[in-house]
Amino acid sequence: MWTDRWGVTYNDNRTALIHIDNECFCCEEYTIPEGVRSIEDNFMLIDNKRLRKINLPSTLRYMVDNTFIECPLEELVLPEGLTEIPGCMCESCLELKRVVLPSTLRVIGNAAFCHCKILSNIVLPDGLEIIHADAFACCVSLK
């Protein structure tokens, strides 16, 4: 395992983000390195509500449920190659204004963007097959 200076731990070959130390993590912007294929912990920072921007690698293919729940992200750009958005991925991200979905996206999980109250615009890709229940519930600004 390898842990960076912000308390984010990756597996030995650095293809999976496996743990985020909530007491050490204090970034407003964080970049997950290229080569990481999965995020297996979430960024719900109980004591730290600073994360405004996350840069995801083009190699990302899997994210755990609740990945960014309650984070103060303002924008999220999901990489091409990602086929599924997990359940509750951005639930209650109250600062989230903009999301860019990849053309490869097939599934949006349950409550993925629920309560993102200022999310105002999202373009759904042509190949999208499934939008689970409440994916956009209470997104009162969505057009």
Located regions from the model:
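Structural signature of tandem-repeat unit edges
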Residues: 1-14, 21-38, 47-62, 71-84, ...
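Consensus positions within tandem repeat domains that build extended binding/scaffold surfaces
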Residues: 42-43, 64-67, 86-89, 109-112, ...
